[in-house]
Structures are given as structure tokens and as C-alpha cells.
Design a protein with these regions (language model features):
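A conserved short coil-to-beta-strand element within the FAD-binding core of flavoproteins
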Residues: 8-21
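A glycine-rich dinucleotide-binding beta-alpha-beta segment and adjacent secondary-structure elements
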Residues: 8, 183-256
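Glycine-centered tight beta-turn/hairpin loop motif at sheet-sheet or coil-to-beta transitions
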Residues: 27-29
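Short hydrophobic core segments
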Residues: 12, 31-51, 59-60, 110-116, ...
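Central helical "cap/lid" subdomain
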Residues: 48-73, 104
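An anion/pyrophosphate-binding glycine-rich loop and adjacent beta-alpha core
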Residues: 64-68, 75-201
Length: 256
């Protein structure tokens, strides 16, 4: 037996190196002596589970370099103007975070529209790059079954011919649900009325709708907080620890 003593419900507030060992101090005044210390306190994600970032402060107080925690693998908050009324709709999509003209990250998968913005695995994997002022580009054409934007455009023109007398609001029937179809048309500045027919679609209208379906730009306002995040980015610098042993390079007996 290793004769390890397990102590629970104790908050460690300070860690000091003394002689050849370590002393940990708790909030209620207890002192714990050890030859080695392993810090595995997690980040700030899901604080209701006890992950509040306090373990990182123990390291930074010892001079260990670190990066501030930030929510990662979480939902992205966007401007809600163009996605109003789409909450609950799931689609296959390609999403990318754009900073000016640079693509910072791109993912494929299922996207879920929400009142605050968008969610889904592909969105959450982009969250660490999402910042206020950047854009989230959403492409739906491949999820609709098309190889590229050109094939989508050709389908629109084919429907204009074959469905000339059908209501224009039905132009995307079979490709997406009516609520999403209406939102795409609004974003593409289609002025659809009850009397509008598919045969009245112009080449310019087809081009605008194609651009919207292939590169719908949603202004990013931020991300959901640590309460919603599955993980947090940031933390102690990995360069400060030996990758083979996880021991601190400067402080013997300290592991993280």
C-alpha cells in the first residue's frame, strides 16, 4: 500500500518551495508538506464542476509563464438580424472565421441556428478564433448536395425555366426548409411578394442568392462564456515543462 492520504473539500490558496520540498497552504489555514506537487486543476470551463482557474494562479505566483484562459469549444454569438426566426434549424455547412480577408479557421459539419447566433460541433471548433469584429462565413451549397457554387447557380436557372409559373418563394423547395429559404432570399435582397414567380428571377438575383448560399457572412459579436464552454484555451506555457516528465524545468518537484 502507498499509504496516500486523501483530503477533499479543501481550497489550496498558496504553494511555496521550502528546502527540498513543497508546502501548500489552504484557505482554512491547513499546511500540507510534500516532496512533489502535481497541479491538475483544469481551466475555467464549466465552473459549476469546480474548474475556476485558481490552479493557474498557483503557477503564476511561482513565476510560471501562462496565457489567460478563454472559452473554447463553445457557441458563437453573431449579429441576429439576418438569422432572425431560424432558431432550432439544423443544416450541414462549412463555416470559417474571417479576419478582414484572412481565413483563420475552417470546419465542416452540422450547424444549429439559435437566437443568439450559431452552435454545432463545427462552430464550436471555430470558437477560439471568434472575436468581436470578425466574420463567420457560412457556406450551405455542399450541404444542399451541390459540388460548388456554380452547380447551385445552374440549378437556380434550371428552376427558373422549369418552374416559371411557381411562386418565387418556392425556388429553394427541396434544398432547405422554408424558414431558411426565406432568410436566404432576404439576405440576397430578393423582393419576393405573393405574386412573384420563379420565372421572374433575373441573372443578377441568381448571382446574389448564390453568393449568399455559398458565403453568408455573419458579424461575430463574441462567444458564449465559460459556463457553456466544453474546454478553455490558454493556461500554463508548455515550454516551461519537460514534455517527457511534465516536471517544471526551473522548479524541481513541480508537475502540471
Amino acid at each position: 500500500a502507498l499509504h496516500v492520504r486523501v483530503v477533499t473539500s479543501v481550497s489550496i490558496t498558496a504553494l511555496h518551495r521550502e528546502n527540498d520540498g513543497w508546502t501548500a497552504l489552504s484557505a482554512d489555514g491547513q499546511r500540507f508538506r510534500a516532496n512533489r506537487v502535481i497541479i491538475s486543476g483544469g481551466g475555467c470551463a464549466q465552473p459549476k464542476l469546480g474548474s475556476d482557474g485558481s490552479a493557474l494562479r498557483l503557477l503564476t505566483n511561482l513565476g510560471c509563464p501562462a496565457t489567460t484562459f478563454a472559452p473554447a469549444l463553445t457557441q458563437i454569438i453573431t449579429d441576429s438580424t439576418s438569422i432572425k426566426g431560424l432558431s432550432g434549424i439544423r443544416v450541414k455547412a462549412q463555416v470559417a472565421v474571417i479576419d478582414r480577408k484572412s481565413v483563420l479557421n475552417e470546419e465542416d459539419g452540422e450547424l444549429l441556428f439559435a437566437d443568439y447566433g450559431v452552435s454545432g460541433v463545427c462552430v464550436m471548433q471555430c470558437a477560439r478564433y471568434a472575436k468581436d469584429g470578425r466574420m463567420l462565413r457560412v457556406s450551405l451549397v455542399k450541404g444542399m448536395g451541390f459540388a460548388d457554387a456554380g452547380e447551385f447557380r445552374r440549378e437556380l436557372h434550371q428552376r427558373r425555366k422549369n418552374w416559371a409559373q411557381r411562386p418565387m418563394a418556392e425556388m429553394l423547395t427541396g434544398l432547405c426548409v422554408p424558414r431558411l429559404s426565406a432568410a436566404l432570399m432576404r439576405q440576397a435582397d430578393w423582393r419576393v411578394t405573393e405574386s412573384s414567380l420563379c420565372g421572374q428571377m433575373t441573372a443578377d438575383m441568381a448571382e446574389r442568392l448564390t453568393k449568399t448560399a455559398d458565403a453568408w457572412l455573419l458579424p461575430i459579436r463574441g462567444v458564449k462564456g465559460f459556463e457553456s464552454a466544453q474546454v478553455a484555451s490558454g493556461g500554463a506555457s508548455v515550454a516551461d515543462f519537460d514534455p517527457a516528465t511534465l516536471q517544471n524545468r526551473r522548479l524541481p518537484g513541480l508537475y502540471a
